[in-house]
Design a protein with these regions (language model features):
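Short, well-structured hydrophobic secondary-structure segments
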Residues: 39-40, 47-66
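Conserved NAD+-utilizing ADP-ribose enzyme module
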Residues: 2, 9-30, 52-54, 64-78, ...
């Protein structure tokens, strides 16, 4: 499976003969650790032989346009690595829907479902910012996150828009042998 990951230039220099690189957990922002840990649990369930490391993030589609900003801090020398990874070692998810996981939100497939769930939730839960939430609300939210992987349902949903869907790909190990192209750039 072809994917692209945006990395600082120094990542390539970390490779030694046959070495495998794993994502550094120190780079996971504390406020999103719950989401990254949830993704690790999903990778454990869905990727054979997954070893529990934090994921590398990449794009499955579309290929990142290096003329855009936001990939790295402005002025940073970076590179877009084109990778070819065994499909069984990659977990695809919808980038926009992923933000509900990051923000501990309920991932609805329609406006009606979203509004109905939130009406019930707001009537029943006093502290909406507590985490974990009381049951069954916590389980409802976490279960809804599984929809981040249902690319067909999200694409078919008017609620998630008709435009291009950005599909991200997570994988555990970055191998030099998987790198099939390197495009250097300076972040805007």
């Amino acid at each position: 499976m072809r994917v692209w990951t945006i990395q600082p230039l120094e990542v390539l220099s970390r490779f030694e003969d046959g070495q495998v690189l794993y994502a550094n957990p120190a780079h996971v922002p504390q406020e999103f650790r719950h989401a990254y840990d949830w993704m690790r649990a999903q990778m454990q369930r869905r990727i054979p032989g997954y070893g529990g490391h934090y994921p590398w993030w990449s794009w499955h589609s579309p290929r990142p346009d290096l003329r855009q900003s936001g990939y790295l801090p402005c002025g940073t020398q970076g590179m877009r690595l084109e990778l070819e990874i065994e499909p069984s070692q990659v977990l695809l998810s919808d980038f926009d829907a992923w933000h509900l996981v990051l923000n501990r939100g309920y991932l609805a497939l329609s406006e009606h479902e979203d509004e109905a769930w939130h009406r019930r939730f707001e009537a029943a839960v006093l502290d909406r910012w507590a985490w974990p939430l009381p049951e069954p609300w916590h389980s409802d939210i976490v279960t809804s996150w599984e929809r981040v992987f249902d690319l067909e349902a999200l694409a078919a949903s008017n609620y998630w828009g008709e435009g291009p869907h950005y599909i991200q790909a997570t994988f555990e190990a970055l191998r030099l042998a998987d790198v099939h192209g390197v495009t250097p750039f300076v972040a805007r």
